[in-house]
Every structure is written in C-alpha cells, then in structure tokens.
Amino acid sequence: WETITGKLEWTEAIRGCDGVVNLAGAPVATRWDKKYKETLVNSRLGCTKRIADAINKLPEKERPSLVSASAVGYYGTTRKDEAWTEARGPGGDFLASLCEKWEKAANKAKTNVTVVRTGVVLEKGGGALGKILPLFYLYSGGPVGSGTQWVSWIHREDLVDIMIMALKNPKKFKGVVNGVAPEPTTMNGLCEAIAKATNRPNWLPAPGLAVRVLLGEGATVVLDGQKVVPEKTMEKGYQFKYSDVNSALDAIVNGP
C-alpha cells in the first residue's frame, strides 16, 4: 500500500463503493528480527488506518462497509483441547497484541465493520501448502515440531465466501467472526490429510529446535497453535463447503 501513497486520494478511490476489503499485511511465517517485527506492525496498522480515515472523510450515507482481516493469533497459543470462540479475549504474546491493535485500527472506521480472524488458509498455489506440498511430492514430507499442536485452518474458497457474505450483509456481520473451518485439526492430522491426498508418506518430521533456529521468534506460528471454532460465523448463517481437512485437501490436490 505504501507504493500508492501520495499517488492516489484514497477517499476518492472508494467513493461510490458498497464495501472495502482489507487484507494487507506482511507474511508472519518467516524469521522475525526487530526490523521485521516493525514491518509486521506497519504493514497492517498503516494501511488499515489509511482505509479507516478514507472512509470517515465521506458523508455518513456514502461510507462503504469494511471487511478487515485479522488472525486467530489474536487468541494467543495453547496446547489444551479447549475450543476457543469469538468471545475469547486476546492472548499475551506479540501476535496477539498486534492483532488487537490491528482490529482497533479497523474499528476506527465509522461504518459497519466486520473483522475476520483468519486461520491457516489452505490453497494450492501459495500459503502454507505452497511450502509443504512440494516436500510431500518429493517423499520428504512430515509434521513440523511435535505434531500435536492445533491447526485452525480454512479452505480459501470458504474464506472468500465468508467475506463476500459479510459485504452483502454488512449489518448482520458487523463485529468479529472467525475465518476457520468448524473442525480444527493437529499438525499430524493436517500432514496425514496431505499424505492421503498426494498418495505420499507422512514420515519425515522437522524437529522443533531446528525450526526455532531457522525462524527464531517467528517459529511460534508453526510450532504453537490454538483450537479455534467459527461459532459466530455459523450463527450468522454461513455454511461451510469444506468442514473437514480431508475433503479440503482432496479438493485442493486432486480437484480441477
């Protein structure tokens, strides 16, 4: 978003729009140092503040609704089996604090705001699977860390459809919804589903210590997790296409 700063008046860019979707944010599943943590913050808060300001400059009746991304990192991490809903408060780590600030920035917009706390997005061409699938095809795939950590995931089609539904029903979807599938899995469960879909073995784990050496503090994204369910999302009427990870992976790997 920084590349268009000064080249485009954002308020004029959104004038006449029914809704705005904000997905801006630097990747978290990489090595963090002090400078990159600043990038994680600025890439989210800077853009979101600009969008909220642009919306607020419009007359009230002309303001579009806002669908703004957040992440399940808002809740912190746990190894417990308790399922967390949208009602749970924020955790106490860096990502939780970042998500909390990110959401507050979005809610500065004086319009109907939907915050989507997104889990691990499964898609063939990128994201987590973009890094994991090639390893399985090379017969070298396996769980990262202990394998028992929770993975709250969502198929990309479901995430897109949730956001579209929020755009079409801004008053109904005002507030927070979890962008995760109804059936979270573990890292082992995810890798077993990948192995089944690719017809490859799930046998070569990546030790947690090695991942921490490689990613530093950023390793928390893949080594720790949280069991999150989309209670409010379903209460608002969304019906998931992919509720279980096996059907999602089969569609991604073997679908058209």
Where is each model-derived feature located?
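NAD(P)H-binding glycine-rich loop region in Rossmannoid oxidoreductase-like domains
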Residues: 1-50
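SDR active-site strand-loop-helix element
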Residues: 20-24, 66-72, 116-118
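Catalytic helix-loop patch of NAD(P)-dependent Rossmann-fold dehydrogenases
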Residues: 42, 78-115
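Conserved Rossmann-fold NAD(P)-dependent oxidoreductase catalytic core, especially the SDR/UDP-sugar
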Residues: 49-93
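NAD(P)-dependent short-chain dehydrogenase/reductase
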Residues: 93-96, 111-115, 119-151, 156, ...
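Glycine/proline-rich active-site loop of Rossmann-fold NAD(P)-dependent oxidoreductases
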Residues: 122-131, 165-177
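Mid/C-terminal beta-alpha module of Rossmann-like enzyme folds, strongest
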Residues: 162, 169-217, 250-256
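C-terminal amphipathic/interface module of NAD(P)-dependent oxidoreductases
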Residues: 220-256
